[in-house]
């Protein structure tokens, strides 16, 4: 077990206006920005798609490692684990795989995501679909060589969204690794 496995970390999810105000311009500057604030974690935002290349991510990872900063990745917001459309659920698995690739390049191991809405189905039916999609995602990660990655569903605040504490705990229970 290394230090990253147990150390409590504090960081931000993305950058604020202060990033540019302090003179930072590129995502390559994120480790310096994070360290300047005295933080040791950073959640890289891929909310609108995974657009960070692995080469650039590798450079960011090297700088972050020297500063004791650990990255995680927030997967795209358009994940829909419980969609009535099978293709959208399969797309959600693909988005998680893309996120895993960039997360690995950043030296991270946690992929944060929102599970999506219930749509026009009961919460119970939506949760069953989401649990199935989560199982598929875990299997896909393992098959693609990302078995060390942890999927981290977030709670959601709106009534129509899947993501109460109990629903998130059920999703987390899928991954037995």
Which stretches of residues belong to each language-model region?
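N-terminal pre-domain/capping segments
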Residues: 1-98
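Active-site acidic/histidine proton-transfer and metal-coordination neighborhood
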Residues: 65-66, 82-177
């Amino acid at each position: 077990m290394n230090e990253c496995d147990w150390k409590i970390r504090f960081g931000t999810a993305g950058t604020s206006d202060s990033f540019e105000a302090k003179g930072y311009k590129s995502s390559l500057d994120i480790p310096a920005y994070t360290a300047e604030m005295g933080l040791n974690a950073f959640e890289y935002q891929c909310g609108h798609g995974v657009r960070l290349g692995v080469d650039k991510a590798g450079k960011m990872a090297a700088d972050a490692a020297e500063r004791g900063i650990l990255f995680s990745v927030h997967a795209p917001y358009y994940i829909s684990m419980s969609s009535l459309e099978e293709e959208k659920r399969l797309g959600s698995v693909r988005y998680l795989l893309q996120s895993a690739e960039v997360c690995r390049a950043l030296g991270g191991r946690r992929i944060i995501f929102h599970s999506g809405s219930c749509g026009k189905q009961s919460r119970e039916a939506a949760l069953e679909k989401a649990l199935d999609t989560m199982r598929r995602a875990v299997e896909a990660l393992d098959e693609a060589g990302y078995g060390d990655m942890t999927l981290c569903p977030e709670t959601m605040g709106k009534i129509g969204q899947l993501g109460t504490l109990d629903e998130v705990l059920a999703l987390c229970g899928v991954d037995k690794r």
